[in-house]
């Protein structure tokens, strides 16, 4: 009994140690699940049902994304009073208790995207109203209506950035954003907005960026947000965009009206700073030249604007088109995928600062190049996929395209270009004339040649670096048509017979070429082995779709990185070819869709070792009339191929000799059977006496 107190003390001591140990383990586990670095606690995707309580109290940022929290209770965040950033993205939240943010006096950024806050929006709104320093709020993806959003944003005058994207907003008025005088950026994309009342944004005096993409707005009339710098109204159903007819200076710099149903060029502010205008994928056209101007009363459209008891009528001249718009600062204009049949006279003159013009996928049939049209500042012009059959260059005009660097004329109906057009573009580096039925001039055309040219001359274009002539129906090249250029990229694909089985017509640009595409040009059909030894800087070579029966030579071309030999007539992968230094330095090679013989792929193992075959699983070969994947071949030459290595004469001798001997014996027996006297004589002479 005297030892009982001692045992009790020891037991109590061990219980305390065990309890402290267990508590320490729990704390370590709660911190171990979250990544804590420099006052940032990242607890995303940990399947947490509540906010962890064991994180550092001085944490400034807490990320709880993708956890099934469901409810944010009053006490959930009490342990972290210094939070400045809180992210609760995709937490299944349907309720935020009244005092959940009561202790969060420092919170500036709050993300509540992709939750279910519409279910208890009044209580959640009460919780948000306690955040007096909040600057950024993300409420996207919560099924909020405009009334719910208005209640949640009420009294949050400190907000600078708000996202209400992917909700169910339909109609906006001045009550939704009331009191948000400091708001700079507003994201309303992917809602169901079909109407915006006049004055809905008038109280947002500091608003600079507005995103209304992916809604159902049918038109924007009397646009007067002069302070706005960025406006995105793409992917709506706009048929009209009309800025207010006032002399106030607009700050708008970027306007995106792409992917709508615009019928006319937008009427832009009369005084503005617009430098980027996106109008692709609409139904725009210029109609002045198509309309009978003798009926002025039919040349206007009137818009009736009803705002409460006030009715305004806006009258717009339909054929005025662009005349009153300020385009002087415009640098980037995209009008691709429209229905433009022509560009009005003077249109491009109003854009002296224009550097990028995209007109692809329209209905243009001709283009006149005059003084200041296109403007001298233009560096990139895309006229691809139109119906251009004529390019007109004003007589005596030189240097009109002196700053042009990228010129795309692909997929048109051009047969030639005006003499001197490319030489006036003295800075051009990239030219795409693919899919035009042009022909190359057999000799240099004089610059003072006045007759329309029916061919194209690329000689002596010193600045040209990239040229695409894919699918132009060109005949065999003669007399070095690229002489005087320093081409690094050349595409001659789909011009059958253009090289006439030899790469010698490219000798003038061979030292500078880095990327060469000779896809589907008829190489290898009855021609000698292709030799690219003179192409010392070649990095990429496309020889697919030809009839090559052997690997091309690359002696001295150590820069080669990519080689495409698909869809040829290669039957073997010799070891000697694979061991060449240029092929050993390859990074990517394509070899599929060739009729390889499995008995001739001894170089396959070395290629696999280099790990450069991009279409490895698609390469097949023929083994005993069976098509199998080369990766399934056993190491070394298959057993079935050994007979193929024996001398052919000896093979046939071994095959025929037994047949001949058998035939000789059979013939002798038959002959003797029908010659009975002779047979008896042989028997009598070959008869031996028996011992019996």
Swiss-Prot record:
GO cellular component: a single term: endoplasmic reticulum
Domain LRRNT intervals: 29-56
A Gene Ontology molecular function term of the record: transforming growth factor beta binding
SMART domains: LRR_BAC, LRR_TYP
Protein location: Cell membrane; Endoplasmic reticulum membrane
GO biological process terms on file: immune response; inflammatory response; microglia development; sequestering of TGFbeta in extracellular matrix; superoxide metabolic process; transforming growth factor beta receptor signaling pathway
Transmembrane segments: 651-671
Cytoplasmic compartment segments: 672-692
InterPro entries the UniProt entry points to: Leu-rich_rpt, Leu-rich_rpt_typical-subtyp, LRR_dom_sf, SLRP
Keywords for the protein's UniProt record, in alphabetical order: Cell membrane, Disulfide bond, Endoplasmic reticulum, Glycoprotein, Growth factor binding, Leucine-rich repeat, Membrane, Repeat, Signal, Transmembrane, Transmembrane helix
LRR repeats: 58-79, 82-103, 106-127, 133-155, 158-179, 182-203, 206-227, 228-239, 251-272, 273-294, 329-350, 353-374, 377-398, 403-424, 427-448, 463-484, 486-507, 512-533, 537-558, 559-580, 585-605
Record has Transmembrane helix as a keyword: yes
Signal sequence bounds: 1-24
Domain LRRCT: 606-643
Topology in the lipid bilayer: Single-pass type I membrane protein
Residue spans, topological domain Extracellular: 25-650
Family note: Belongs to the LRRC32/LRRC33 family.
Subunit structure: Interacts (via LRR repeats) with TLR2, TLR3, TLR4, TLR9 and probably other Toll-like receptors. Interacts with CYBB/NOX2; the interaction is direct. Interacts with TGFB1; associates via disulfide bonds with the Latency-associated peptide chain (LAP) regulatory chain of TGFB1, leading to regulate activation of TGF-beta-1.
Role this protein plays: Key regulator of transforming growth factor beta-1 (TGFB1) specifically required for microglia function in the nervous system. Required for activation of latent TGF-beta-1 in macrophages and microglia: associates specifically via disulfide bonds with the Latency-associated peptide (LAP), which is the regulatory chain of TGFB1, and regulates integrin-dependent activation of TGF-beta-1.
Protein name stated in the entry: Transforming growth factor beta activator LRRC33
Source organism of this protein record: Rattus norvegicus
Taxonomic classification: Eukaryota, Metazoa, Chordata, Craniata, Vertebrata
